From Swiss-Prot:
Its biological purpose: May play a role in DNA repair. It seems to be involved in an RecBC-independent recombinational process of DNA repair. It may act with RecF and RecO.
GO MF, one example: zinc ion binding
An individual GO BP term: DNA repair
Xref: InterPro entries: DNA_Rcmb_RecR (IPR000093), Rcmb_RecR (IPR023627), Rcmb_RecR_Znf (IPR015967), TOPRIM_dom (IPR006171), TOPRIM_RecR (IPR034137)
Pfam families listed in its UniProt record: RecR_C, RecR_HhH, RecR_ZnF, Toprim_4
Domain of life assignment: Bacteria
PANTHER family named among the record's database cross-references: RECOMBINATION PROTEIN RECR (PTHR30446:SF0)
Domain Toprim: 82-177
UniProt gene name: recR
Descriptive protein name: Recombination protein RecR
Similarity field: Belongs to the RecR family.
The entry's keywords: DNA damage, DNA recombination, DNA repair, Metal-binding, Zinc, Zinc-finger
Zinc finger region(s), C4-type: 59-74
Organism (species): Caulobacter vibrioides (strain NA1000 / CB15N) (Caulobacter crescentus)
């Protein structure tokens, strides 16, 4: 960091550098851009962040983010509650909704099982998922997890946990590239993967 930067600027750079995809250099560039455009960018961003901090909450049903609890998807009576799509993170819900192909409900795990990172089933919302399926209203669980080692491990674990419920567990077809995340897929690929899902 530049010696001429005061502690306020250094703190801004340090915080921006913690965002996904940003490091110290890009955090510094982002901080400079914000400070250059205080009225048109920094002030509105600060307001939006304060509003998000105050109003956005986690949906108690699915784990997504919204300003209401339950979220808009869970509260929408026109959605097919028999279809439950399990995703890793909220970004995947947004990707699925952007595509407009899925009309069921979601369950956000909050991560994936990972032996390397020490993330076990208790750290995820798998128990809540089992509870939602066990209540008898779900007719199919669709696993829309990344085609990575951790994603596949999580999918197999969930399929095993749900085996006794006799509810079919399917996975998105391989239109999702290996190593790919839903956040990065185009709408057509997501729609095709949904149509071609298969048993887990």
């Amino acid at each position: 960091m530049a010696a001429s930067a005061g502690p306020e600027i250094e703190r801004l750079i340090a915080l921006l550098s913690k965002l996904p995809g940003l490091g110290p250099r890009s955090g510094r560039r982002a901080a400079l851009a914000l400070l250059k455009k205080r009225d048109t960018l920094l002030a509105p961003l600060a307001t939006a962040m304060a509003e998000a901090q105050a109003k956005v909450r986690t949906c108690g049903t699915c784990g997504s983010l919204d300003v209401t609890d339950p979220c808009a998807v869970c509260a929408d009576g026109s959605r097919d509650g028999r279809l439950l799509c399990v995703v890793e993170e909220v970004g995947s819900v947004w990707a699925m909704e952007r595509g407009g192909s899925f009309k069921g409900r979601y369950h956000v795990l909050g991560g994936l099982l990972s032996a390397l990172d020490g993330i076990g089933p208790e750290a995820l919302r798998i128990g809540e998922l089992v509870g939602r399926v066990a209540d008898g209203s779900v007719a199919e669980v669709i696993l829309a997890l990344p085609a990575t080692v951790d994603g596949q491990t999580t999918a197999h674990y969930i399929a095993d946990r749900l085996a006794k419920t006799n509810v079919p567990v399917t996975m998105l077809a391989r239109g999702v590239p290996v190593g790919g995340d839903l956040d990065w897929l185009d709408d057509g690929t997501i729609a095709q993967a949904l149509r071609a899902r298969r048993p887990a």
